[in-house]
Amino acid sequence: RIDAAGLLVIPGIIDSHMHASSWLAGRKSYKMLALAGVTTALEMAGPLEDVKEGLREDGSGITVGCLEMIRPGWNVQSASPKAEELSEVIFNALDRGAFGVKLLGGHYPLTPEASAQLIRLCDNNGVYLGIHAGSTEQGSNINGVKEIVDCAEGHAFHLAHMNAYCRGNILDVPQEVAFVEKILQSHPEIDSESYLSPINGCSGKCIDGVPESGITRNCLHSHGYEETQQGLREAIEDGFARVHLQKTDSVVLAEPNEGLRLWLEQNTNASMSFAVNPSLSNFYFATQKRPNGTFLSDSFCTDGGGIPRNVILENGLSLVKFGAITLKEFVFKSSTSAANLLGLANKGRLVVGADADITVVDYAKQKAVHAFS
């Protein structure tokens, strides 16, 4: 028996985009998410077998689906795979239990032509596709968003973390936000989410003196650092790049000296975060609505898990207290709409016959007290 007097009891929070594999975020993700009130989550990269193993050994009881990444040099030979190769990878992933597949365009891109082929294959076959915009031609920015929507030619897909494309890298942030809003308003077939944290998450791995991830290079460039291993080292020393430190039950951002030591000990293959997300774009995509009253971006996510930014509840309730959204709207966007986005008919609502996913919240402290899944 749980005494919930004075607490909020809401449908279990659904994180429509997180990371939990050892490749990016680590297996402490599952406990970190549960402690943040999350009861259901979509892991958006894989590798699938690593996620399965992590759930078996370190799962916290939350429900998890996984999108298998499409990554050149890993499960496709190059950045321009043909339809036959893509089909083989897609259906192999589904046969092994994947919820769908993910294009990591901002980190490990395909050509625009291959990206378009992937979108057509998935939509025509009813396969769930998540996309981080970006290609071999355009980066993870507003130009990448326009390009991937053009590539889709009206086909549906899930476009990840709308706030993360509006960091002022092409235009001023307000102009970028308006640019992306116009695209979303014109393409209701595209589902999307956004997150509420100032930090991102990426890899510090370097190959031949250059950061492997396009996102890492973008972050360095945006703040005047060289897009090299030396530039990344300087960013770590300055505290701009914060290496992830594994503690007993969580992941935290290391202080500069310790972060540099971890990065070097791991031969640069360490995950890290940069404080690159403007509050304007975070706020806008969390609250903005379409003319018909529905939210412009469908759901909240963390893009976290093992990346220490699991703040749907903490920062989402700040929006409620600020008056930007109502408590009912917070519940809708953090659970009901996310369930609809993922096709989870038995989640996102507290009704007889639905899954008994419940988050119990201390509203004053903006913290989860219990999470049942």
Task: Explain the meaning of each model-derived region.
Residues 6, 17, 37, 64, ...:
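Divalent metal-coordination and catalytic microenvironments
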Residues 12-18, 41-43, 64-69, 101-103, ...:
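Hydrophobic faces of well-ordered beta-strands that scaffold small-molecule active sites
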Residues 83-100, 109-267, 276-296:
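Histidine/acidic residue-rich metal-binding segments in metalloenzymes
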Residues 280-361:
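His/Asp/Glu-enriched, well-ordered alpha-helical/loop segment
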Residues 365-371:
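Short, Lys/Arg- and Gly-enriched loop/turn segments at beta-strand edges
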Residues 20-21, 135, 306:
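Short active-site segment of divalent metal-dependent hydrolases/proteases
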Residues 26-108, 120-127:
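Divalent-metal coordination cores built from histidine and acidic residues
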